[in-house]
Amino acid sequence: MVISMRSMDKSDEEKGKWVLLQAPGFNCATIGAVAMIIIHVVVMSTGGIFPDGAEGGLRSLYIQLGLTWEGVSSGHVWQLFTYFWLHGNWGHLVLNVILFYYSCARLSHVLSSSRILVLFLAVSIGSGLIHISAQAVFDGVPKDPLVGASGGIMGLLLAYFALSPGSRMLLIPVSANNLAKGILIASALLFVATPSLGLPFLSDMGGGLVDLLGPGLFQIAHLLHFAGGLIGWVSIPRFFPKLLTLEDLVRMRNQSEIVAELR
């Protein structure tokens, strides 16, 4: 079963066409979103992963399942598979669930659920490895445990942008290709501008952004977003089969009509 959503592709907008997204059902978009919600409800019902003054149980959950270089290098390799199922608060969860569902639903038109799942897991693990590698190399990278699926989701979103570079998202008047480049550039710049890294000029710029927008700006894992987005963006043409474009279909139809006429 599917539901109709307005297409953000310019040509489709002009023709008034509609694009189909998966409705809730037994598919990767729904299963992944529901799993994130259930896990968060269970965690929050017992106090959350950031309880004030917590000791033992909940804090241990955060330390054991959140991702850090110290944890993985100590043998807690499961953190690479668990960190992206936990979220810090409801706002964090809701945003990630919406983007996860949107990305999976769009990708489901050209990729199977199993391939979308493989892509999500590969991007989540790959971006997580890059994040903790930076923790090991740079003293200024926060050493707090990382939680959240945004790295993998960024990979899914930019994978969709790579498959449909001319499409447009609601309220964002640029092509998916340019939006993907903008996201990658912004994420990279925000990472290198992190004040705690102490990079000349860039850290000063980051300090100015903190004064303007608040310290929460650099509590976001910008390197994770950059790494996840880049992996998703470049992996589609390299590791997935070439997808048929509208031009390919038109050419195939014309060829079949010519063959039919010759007969």
Residue ranges and their predicted role:
Residues 1-31, 35-37, 187-263:
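C-terminal transmembrane module of polytopic alpha-helical membrane proteins
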Residues 25-32, 90-97, 175, 179-182, ...:
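Alpha-helical transmembrane segments
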Residues 120-123, 172-187:
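Central hydrophobic cores of alpha-helical transmembrane segments
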Residues 80-167, 195-227:
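Transmembrane helix-loop-helix
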Residues 52-85, 204-212:
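Extracytosolic (periplasmic/ER-lumenal) interhelical loops and adjacent juxtamembrane/interface segments
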Residues 37-52:
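Alpha-helical transmembrane segments of multi-pass membrane proteins
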Residues 109-110, 162-176, 241-248:
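Alpha-helical transmembrane bundle and helix-membrane interface signal
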